[in-house]
Amino acid sequence: PYAVKAAISILEKGGTATDAAIAAHLVLGLVEPQSSGLGGGGFMLNYDFKTNNLTFIDGRETAPASAKIDMFMKDDGNVMSFMEAVPSGKAVGTPGIVALYETAHKAYGLLPWPMLFEDAINLSKNGFIVSPRLANYVELAEKRGRLSKNPLTKKYFYPNDVKIKSGDLLKNPEYANTLKAIAKEGAIAFYNSNIAKEIVSAVNADPHPGEMTLVDLKNYNAVLRPVICGPFRNMKICTTSPPSSGGAQIMIAGLYDQLINNESNESEKISAFVDAQRLAYADRDHFFGDPDEVNIPLEALLDPKYNLSW
């Protein structure tokens, strides 16, 4: 509810949907840090109803420039397990969400930039009530030892050595300070500053350090990419192009329509949807990737004739 309230507040002040989305996401980074936050990335698909134009901003994380194909290999020649790799610095990409915020706000925002940060800053300083969702995550992470091993996460999620629980009041003054800096100076306060130095230090810390550099952060930019559209019955589905999986949505819709007919019952429709997902995801995993690095046969994959071949 905190994020929704922040978004509504922005809309009531005359902000755009983009303004509201940024404000909501900043709050989510506080109240649901396991799912959102400044250390990640995102995609934004924006529709301008006045011009009927769609634009796509790619603010996803990028691999550090020094990333190598064998970076997840251990010294003994074996590949790191999922649970070894995910908490390590090797799995951390150069964060893009702050650049996405700024790019989107410059293009589609209306309210002053600092105003978007107010609710998140106030909640960080004054505290928010821990939700069952966050408490459950901490419970699960505790079983894996993922929070208590890191001094900073232990301090935050185990104040006074007591694990947080649903209903507790939790404050995050460090997050408030970071947001204040970005609100005052813009994205440069995140990508070319002491904050950037702290990010690099954390990512490259033992026991499984990554290889992110200050140059990776300084050089990061959100990217405008094409919007892709495809037919579905008498409608048109428009979504995000690679590196997102938006194209798979169009493929799923087309495949689903090929697998059912007017006489299909609910069970058959569910089965068709599952099969459509399975087939589309197989192609996604095989063909999709970073369009700056690989050639993706997207036009062929989205061709309705391709669906008929199944």
State where each predicted segment sits:
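Short conserved micro-motifs at the rims of enzyme active sites and ligand-binding pockets
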Residues: K68-I69, Q249-M251, P291-D292
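Noncatalytic scaffold domains of N-terminal-nucleophile
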Residues: P1-K5, A17-T18, I22-G186, F190-N192, ...
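Extended, domain-scale alpha-helical bundle/helix-rich regions
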Residues: C238, S245-M251, Q258, N262-N265
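Internal maturation/activation junctions in enzymes
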Residues: I260-W310
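Generic recognition of well-ordered alpha-helical segments
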Residues: A6, L100, T178, M251, ...
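Long, structured ligand/cofactor-binding scaffold of large enzymes
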Residues: S9-L11
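Short helix-capping/linker segments at secondary-structure and domain boundaries
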Residues: K106-L111, E185-A187, Y256-S264, D285-G289
